[in-house]
């Protein structure tokens, strides 16, 4: 394999390589190899880092929308078994497009990642809020937010304060609490004195 350089988002080396299935480019993400395939008329040896990254993002079903500035982590558009969603360090938000043939439902919060200008600071903030991000850890700069899980079919949704791998259950009425109360629950859950809010 030939090294083309480091992937800007995950800082892993990107390789150009020939495998059983033919020429490819690949890198590691979360301890898994992710691949991209050059177009038929491309010479593998001519592929530089930018093109390799483009091929990997195109073919691995992930697309970087923007890199969040506090954490340095990418906000990704992914395809999962339930369709398209936006993902950021374990927090996710499903794409929800308005219906084409009938009026929008005022109770539904539509979310279309293709209609957004990711150069715009307000858009980035809107995306982070949609992902339920509240702030950033004072030491690791990892995002802190609320993750909602459904433990089983019969159960209600359960809310967790999440930062990195750590998830601590929190009251279901978390969003109805005063901001000060929310913040003290977060500090207590993560054993921190303060954190940067978004």
Model-derived features: where do they sit?
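Basic, low-complexity terminal or inter-domain segments flanking catalytic cores
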Residues: 1-198
């Amino acid at each position: 394999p030939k090294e083309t350089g480091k992937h800007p988002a995950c800082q892993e080396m990107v390789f150009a390589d020939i495998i059983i299935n033919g020429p490819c480019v690949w890198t590691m993400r979360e301890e898994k190899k992710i691949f991209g395939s050059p177009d038929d008329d491309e010479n593998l040896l001519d592929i530089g880092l930018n093109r390799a990254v483009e091929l990997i993002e195109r073919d691995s079903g992930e697309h970087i929308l923007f890199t969040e500035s506090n954490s340095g982590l990418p906000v990704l558009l992914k395809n999962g078994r339930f369709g398209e969603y936006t993902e950021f360090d374990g927090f996710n938000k499903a794409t929800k497009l308005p219906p084409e043939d009938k009026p929008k439902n005022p109770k539904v919060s539509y979310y279309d990642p293709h209609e957004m200008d990711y150069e715009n600071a307000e858009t980035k903030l809107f995306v982070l809020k949609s992902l339920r991000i509240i702030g950033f850890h004072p030491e690791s700069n990892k995002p802190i937010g609320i993750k909602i899980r459904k433990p089983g079919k019969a159960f209600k949704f359960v809310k967790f304060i999440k930062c990195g791998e750590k998830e601590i259950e929190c009251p279901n009425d978390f969003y109805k609490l005063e901001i000060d109360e929310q913040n003290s629950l977060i500090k207590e859950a993560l054993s921190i004195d303060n954190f940067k809010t978004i």
